[in-house]
Amino acid sequence: MLFAGTLAAQTPVPEWQAGVDKVKSLIKTNPEQASDAAGELLKGKNKKNVELVTSVARAYLDAGQLKEAETYLEMARKADNKAPAVSVLEGDIAFARKDIGKACQLYEQAIYFDSNYKDAYLKYAQAYKSASPSQAIEKLNQLKAIAPDCLEADKELAEVYYATNRFGKAADTYAKFIDTPVATEDDILKYAFALFLNHDFEKSLAVA
């Protein structure tokens, strides 16, 4: 995975998912067969299905095959160049090429096309959380303004606060999601440590 903590899918599995899984499994073992399977999958009206085309592109991206991912990105662009998923995919490819500035421009573009597209906010924040924590926090607060219950935003915010030694804010933000499936063991440890460093020793021991 390029990014951890992306949104968990709550929607039913699409009928073409098995085909994408087949492509994924063949990319490393038999690239030619993977390409044939992708071609078969993207025949006819399927090549206009943005979700499907971006899923195939992402299979190649996750395998580190950026040129192939870009080939399917072009197909996705032809299907709908204003779909936020297409901008996010292009941003992820730029991020994989270590071009963080370009990646974040593309995540911003996705938000311009659809201001409710949560993944774009999260990926922008993930890209900038080391290079520019203040920009990451600003983007996550924008997401919280439109989706107050977004636990993934809380998780990212907590990580940025923790990494920048704002342990009081980190502890308060960890508390919002620590009892949910979004929290990992690492989050629980950091929550306990943030409480400890914020001199909330009793609570820190209870969490740990």
Map each language-model feature to its residues:
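N-terminal leader/linker segments that initiate helical-solenoid repeat arrays
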Residues: 7-74, 78
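Short coil turns that delineate tetratricopeptide repeat
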Residues: 46-47, 81, 115, 148, ...
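Register position in tetratricopeptide repeats
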Residues: 28, 62, 96-97, 126-131, ...
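Conserved structural position within tetratricopeptide repeats
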Residues: 42-44, 74-78, 108-112, 141-145, ...
